[in-house]
Amino acid sequence: MRRKPASLLAGLGLAAAIAAAQTDPGLLTAVVAKDGSGDFTTIQAAMARIGMGSPGRPATIYVRRGVYRELVYAQREKRYVRLIGEDPANTVLVSGLHAGMRGLDGEAIGTFRTPTFHLDADDFTVENLTIQNDAGPVGQALAIAVHGDRVVFRNCRFLGHQDTVFLNRGRHYFAGCTIEGTTDFVFGGATAWFESCDLRALASSYLTAASTPPEAAFGFVFDRCRVQIAAGERSYLGRPWRDHAATLFMRSELGAG
């Protein structure tokens, strides 16, 4: 799906908006609602204002049902924060940037400037939320990029096509999540445990592309997961992005194809 240039310019200006926003250290609970019934009408506005929590008292952003078309950035200072949707079917964070789009300099923005949700913070939790990139089958288009450590996802959906979920580094846990895409839709150098998750391949390609560093004991581990492949398509479980790639499927259901 093509986007208007104004939408792209707004997306690329996200970093400047974040820099101008002032975090409120005392704000540890916030409600996001599109209809104005909460504290904020956008997830990004709440993220920019929420304070850093603690292990015993995490900060929490509650997101009411709705489709939130925006880009969200959780910088490193947003540690011990929970982002909780009402339910993943009806609470959707979505954007449509893709690698071939042109930036302000006239050049393609590239893969790593496309994520709908860019997460740099450690000790972050996301629950009951759909995170989507709806650019379509136009090349690399990330739904989420995770650069923090100890990030937990529960009952979430990650929807896209190529490069849906990028786990750059750190250690992460996915429970009861759905991840959908076409090519390399789980990729990166992180250590990540996926428990009771569904992986849905929309086209013939590769599900994963790990770039596990040589010093890491594990890369991607899928335990009790289900792999579903679209009718008439054939997919591989993975391919190495770099040397030492490590991906393991155990006690999982592997669909035909």
Feature locations, PLM:
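Positively charged n-region of N-terminal signal peptides that target proteins for export
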Residues: 1-4
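Bacterial N-terminal signal peptides
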Residues: 7-17
